[in-house]
Design a protein with these regions (language model features):
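Short glycine/proline-centered loop/turn elements that form peptide/ligand docking sites
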Residues: 144, 167-170, 186-193
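Conserved acetyl-CoA-binding loop-helix of GNAT-fold acetyltransferases
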Residues: 127-130, 136-153, 172-176
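Conserved GNAT acetyl-CoA-binding A-motif
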Residues: 122-124, 151-164
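Conserved beta-strand in the GNAT
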Residues: 51, 57-66
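A short beta-loop-alpha structural element at the N-terminal edge
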Residues: 3-16
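Active-site rim helix/loop that mediates acceptor-substrate recognition in acyltransferases
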Residues: 28-49, 55, 111
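Conserved catalytic-core motifs of GNAT/GCN5-like acyltransferases
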Residues: 68-69, 160-162, 175, 180-195
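Conserved acyl-donor/pantetheine-binding loop and adjacent beta-alpha core of acyl/acetyltransferases
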Residues: 69-127
Length: 203
């Protein structure tokens, strides 16, 4: 049985590895996905990062922040600049020639603020990933429960997330947790869901 526990600094390599392993498209640089979607949360808000660990080691995580706008401001000042110096902006090349690494490098150089429509009532946000060995065993639910408790205790009024439109399994999971699709202007590659903490929801 997997144990859900708070993040420790020694877990950082696992965050990177799981982020890369869970990405359906894959990067040549195994750290790129984690640089965008996992590691910055461990640096900015380790108290709202949790991992799932079994006998084989850390096999899942949930990362996020109780304050999306504060995270975005911090990342713009402190997290993205050194990454932008290491990874060239691919904007000058034809999109049809971009690799997955180029897409991630573009995100580093042009990180999008979350839509106001998502943040206004749901200021926290999250990313969650599980390796296949931990899927379908209630581990995702346990991670989500711990994370929601943490950001609610930190004062967040609700949480939002973005999910790939074709990820039916993830969408079903979020709906079971009480997340509902938000009225957010369409953004290529994302559907937005939110959970208000003043409404009944399933933890």
């Amino acid at each position: 049985m997997a144990e859900v526990r708070p993040y420790r600094p020694g877990d950082l390599a696992d965050l990177y590895w799981i982020a890369d392993a869970a990405d359906p498209d894959g990067c040549a640089d195994a750290n790129l996905v984690g640089e965008v979607f996992a590691a910055p949360y461990a640096a900015f808000s380790p108290a709202t990062v949790f991992v799932a660990e079994d006998a084989s080691g850390v096999g899942g995580y949930i990362v996020g922040t109780a304050d999306t706008r504060a995270f975005e401001a911090w990342a713009e000042a402190d997290w993205w600049p050194p990454l932008r110096a290491r990874h060239a902006d691919p904007s000058g090349r034809p999109h049809e020639r971009w690799t997955r690494d180029d897409v991630m490098a573009w995100l580093i150089h042009h990180y999008r603020r979350a839509p106001d429509e998502a943040v206004a009532r749901h200021p926290a946000h999250l990313h969650i990933n599980l390796l296949p060995r931990l899927q379908g065993r209630g581990v995702g639910r346990a991670l989500m429960t711990r994370w929601l408790e943490a950001v609610r205790a930190a004062g967040a009024a609700g949480a939002h997330l973005a999910v790939r439109p074709d990820n039916a399994r993830a969408i079903a999971f979020y709906r079971r947790r009480g997340f509902r699709e938000l009225d957010v202007p369409p953004l290529k590659g994302a559907r937005w869901f939110g959970l208000g903490f003043d409404a009944p929801h399933l933890l």
